[in-house]
Structures are given as structure tokens and as C-alpha cells.
Amino acid sequence: MNALSALSTEVRQYLLVTGNYWAFTLTDGALRMLVVLHFHTLGYTPLQIAALFLFYEIFGVITNLVGGYLGARLGLNRTMNIGLGLQVIALLMLAVPAAWLTLPWVMGAQALSGIAKDLNKMSAKSSIKLLVPGSQQGTLYRWVAILTGSKNALKGVGFFLGGALLALLGFKGAVVAMAAVLALIWLGSLVMLKKDLGKAKAKPKFRDILSKSRAINILSAARLFLFGARDVWFVVALPVYLSTVFGWDFWLVGGFLATWIIGYGIVQSLAPAITGKQRGHVPDGRAAFVWAGLLAMLPAAIAVGLAGGWSAKVVLLGGLILFGVLFAVNSSLHSYLIVSYAKEDGVSLDVGFYYMSNALGRLLGTLLSGWLYQAYGIGTCLWVSMLFLLLAAVIACALPRHSASHVNCT
């Protein structure tokens, strides 16, 4: 406690925001695995299970757009605490008798969880902007990378946690236990999180939810295609391919993807070292262009390897590991740029608009993944992924660059 009290107010607030985000992320990952496993054992088809998460994604788009406005008007402490509270309610909605767990009821609980997740994420990412002085861009990059990377690593841990809780406590016991722990964290956050954090000095109007910043609009468009490129082959096509072509059972597929997400999160945390922060460099538009261009080569290489008759396991699994490393760097770099570009007064408006594009890209990728894989196979999903990444790279060419940077995008 003495060591904690010796820290600056900004660092203590950062640790509190990060702790809230970590706790939420663990329950988010665990809940996803709980729902998938439990309803799989009840005989739900893969399509029905996918439908359970449809509202989760759709409401993510809406929440990011409106949540930034709410954060600027109410303060980020309130939007973060609202997110934690909504997740507790979503968990308790699933603790009802089994007869109540109809498809619409579970979809409603998932919608609430989706709203909670994006309120929490938007609040956490926006808060960092206010806790780091504008002159310390290297520190800002490092803090954003740690927050983003640790979140994804813990989401993977959450997948394993969900499976373990289901085995130990059953479905109802698992959601009640998670709700109880998260409720305690929520109560602590209500008391300790700084009041009026992120509240705009000038009350924003509702029309301000649409960004007026050229840099943020460009970055948001690039982010849409970046995450669409991942999910167009990762969400549906990859798990189904691993199951049907490789013959992996559900536990092996789930365990592999959870491990991939943990590794992906670790690389995100290390992104500042990978992109040259230790040499005094922080990313700009040129870096976003270069890293997206490098990433675009991978899905194309995987598609060529699969079509050429090479070992599918070597090509796909090896390519997936490399894709995870490069995608983690791209994602962490983008996360830093949005926080850097966002204006300090009403920061959540800019961050919320940006993550709305992120959620829209995920939704687009998810829908295309199912349709393209069913109609044309995984090869087409990979080529579309490459196309999306090339679009993300070209769009990133228009982002601001440091004065010493130059890249010819023509």
C-alpha cells in the first residue's frame, strides 16, 4: 500500500483503469467460451451459436458511436462504471433457470455485454490520453501498447477460464461467480476512479459524434479494413477449416485459438520495441502504411501455398503465427495513433468514432467470412483479406507523417 501511495495520481489512475479493463476482459473472454461450450452441449448448431453473438457485434458499432458522446458529456469514470455494471447484469441474465435461456433471451444478454464491452474499452483507451502529458509521446505509445496487448492476452486466458469454470461450477455457477467478483470490482471503481475524468469543458452536441478531424477520419477508414481483413478469414473460415479439414475437435480448435490470442496480445505489448521506440521513434502515417503493406503479403502467401498443394498444416499454421505477429504490431500502432490524434478536450468523441469503425470492420469481416467460406472456400477469404489490407495501406498513406518521413504512395 505504501508503494502504491507513493505513485503519482496519474499512475494510480492508470493502474485502476487498467485493472478495471483487465477484470472486464477476463469475464468477456470467459463468457464467450461459456456460451459456446454450453449451448454446443445443448445441441445448438454452429449457425445458431453464431447468431447468439450477432447483437454483441451490432451493438458494438452503435455503442462506440454514441459512447464517445456520453463519455465527453458525463465523464469517462461514469461510462467505464456503467460498462462494468452492465456486464454484471448481463452475467446475471444468464443465471436464470434453463427454461428461460431461449435464443432471444441469450441474444439480449449478449447485446448488453457488447454494449458493456465497448463502453469499457472506449473509456480505458480515452483515459490514457488524459493521464500522459502531450509532450511524452513515447510514454503514451508504451502505455497504449501495454493496455491493448494485455487486454488481448487476458481475453485468451479468459477462454481457458470459461472452460475451467464450466467444468468446475457448471454454467449457472460460473456466471454467478463471475458476476460476484466483477460486482466487487465495480463497487471499488465507483469509489476510487477520478470524478469527471474525460468530461469535455464545452458540452458537445450530438452531431459531434462524427469526427471533424481529417487524420481521424482517414485512420478510422484504415482501421475498418484492417480488422475486416483479419475477421474475413479468422472468425468463421479458420475455425471451420481447422475442424473439417484438419479433423480437430472443438477443444483443440478453441485451445489453439486462445493460445494464438494470448501470443498476439504479448506481441502487441512489445510493439513499441519492434517499431523502434527504443531508438526514439514513435509511429506516424508512414509506419502505418509500411506495416499494413507487409501484412498484406501474408494472406496472399498462405492462399498460394494452399492452392499449390503444399502441406496445409505447415502453410496455414505457420502463416497464422506470422500473421498474428504482424497484425499485433499494426493494431498496437493504430491504437497509439488514435489516442495521439484525439483532441484532449472530449477525447472520447474521437476515440469512440474510431472504434465504431473498428467494430464495423469486425462486423463486415464476420459476415463475409461465413458467406465467402461457404460459397468459395478459405482461399477466397484469404484473397479478400489481402485486398482489405492493401486498402488499409493505401488509405494510411494520407495520414500525417513526421517531417523527416517520406513515402511515395503513387
How should these model regions be labeled?
Residues 109-151:
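Cytoplasmic helix-loop-helix junction between adjacent transmembrane helices
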Residues 180-199, 395-399:
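C-terminal membrane-cytosol helix-exit motif in multi-pass small-molecule transporters
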Residues 61-98:
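Conserved MFS/SLC helix-loop-helix module at the cytosolic interface between two early adjacent transmembrane helices
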Residues 7-58, 217-260:
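Helix-loop boundary and gating motifs at the non-cytosolic
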Residues 22, 90, 102-120, 313-329:
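Hydrophobic core of transmembrane alpha-helices in multi-pass small-molecule transporters
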